[in-house]
């Protein structure tokens, strides 16, 4: 039996997490991790909804036979303990240390009414 097993390589276990690129910006999404996978569910923290942009670097987790998209690579350099929420076009909310809330964007709206700036 020992001789019959010589030359055989054991199967490699499949990775449980991979970095890939979003190919379809929707939910379910498409993602490239060496081959394209479609119908990949998109997950985020509770109360937070997002969709990856096409070409964005994403984290793909294996969930049984399926995969799920769990997030994108972080950009920027927040201080330890800070929380940044960034959107397209430079809009951002930054929860900083000391209780400071920093809001950046071209307009600030409350219940649809423009408080500052101009809505395009």
Which ranges hold each PLM region?
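Beta-strand/loop nucleic-acid-binding surfaces
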Residues: 37-50
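Right-handed beta-helix
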Residues: 2-23, 48-120
């Amino acid at each position: 039996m020992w001789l019959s097993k010589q030359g055989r390589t054991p199967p490699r276990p499949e990775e449980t997490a991979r970095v890939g690129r979003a190919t379809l910006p929707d939910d379910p999404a498409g993602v490239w991790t060496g081959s394209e996978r479609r119908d990949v569910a998109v997950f985020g923290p509770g109360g937070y909804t997002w969709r990856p942009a096409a070409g964005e670097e994403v984290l793909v987790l294996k969930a049984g036979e399926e995969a799920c998209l769990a997030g994108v690579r972080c950009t920027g350099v927040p201080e330890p303990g800070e929380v940044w929420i960034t959107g397209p076009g430079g809009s951002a909310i930054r929860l900083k240390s000391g209780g400071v809330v920093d809001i950046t964007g071209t307009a600030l709206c409350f219940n649809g009414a423009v408080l500052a700036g101009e809505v395009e």
